[in-house]
Amino acid sequence: MANDLKLILELSAGAELLFGNIKRRQLSLDGSQKWTIGSLLKWMHANILTRSPELFIQGDTVRPGILVLVNDTDWELLGGLDYELQQNDNILFISTLHGG
């Protein structure tokens, strides 16, 4: 639809393994509602997270060790879960959780 919210979703450093090994997705979300990072995380959990949700989600947020960047800016500087997503935002999730 013309009023859909279009985003680029990127997953790297192992986060993509939880989402079917797809590192980059173009999303088109229902533009009739307000989308925040928090609502995007719920959508991701319900629609594209394919395994081990406990490695990505903890409560209502990402697990510690998952960095979130919005247009190359740390999401915490933008309001964290409450950041309202904008047309053509690039959301990047980077896992810093590694075995050893």
From Swiss-Prot:
Alphabetized HAMAP family for the sequence = Urm1 (MF_03048)
Q: Which Gene3D superfamilies match?
A: 3.10.20.30
Q: What does this protein do?
A: Acts as a sulfur carrier required for 2-thiolation of mcm(5)S(2)U at tRNA wobble positions of cytosolic tRNA(Lys), tRNA(Glu) and tRNA(Gln). Serves as sulfur donor in tRNA 2-thiolation reaction by being thiocarboxylated (-COSH) at its C-terminus by MOCS3. The sulfur is then transferred to tRNA to form 2-thiolation of mcm(5)S(2)U. Also acts as a ubiquitin-like protein (UBL) that is covalently conjugated via an isopeptide bond to lysine residues of target proteins such as Prx2/Jafrac1, Ciao1, Eip71CD and GILT1.
The 1-thioglycine modification is found at G100
Record-level GO BP terms = protein urmylation; tRNA thio-modification; tRNA wobble uridine modification
What keywords sit in the KW lines? Cytoplasm, Isopeptide bond, tRNA processing, Ubl conjugation pathway
Question: What organism does the record attribute this protein to?
Answer: Drosophila willistoni
Q: Where is this cross-link: Glycyl lysine isopeptide (Gly-Lys) (interchain with K-? in acceptor proteins)?
A: G100
Q: Name one GO cellular component term.
A: cytosol
Tell me any Pfam family this protein matches: Urm1
Pathway where this protein functions: tRNA modification; 5-methoxycarbonylmethyl-2-thiouridine-tRNA biosynthesis
Q: Subunit notes for this chain?
A: Interacts with cer.
Chief location category: cytoplasm
**Family designation:** Belongs to the URM1 family.
Mind telling me how this protein is modified after translation?
Answer: C-terminal thiocarboxylation occurs in 2 steps, it is first acyl-adenylated (-COAMP) via the hesA/moeB/thiF part of the MOCS3 homolog, then thiocarboxylated (-COSH) via the rhodanese domain of the MOCS3 homolog.
Protein name listed in UniProt:
Ubiquitin-related modifier 1 homolog
Localization recorded for this chain is:
Cytoplasm
Q: List the disulfide bonds.
A: none
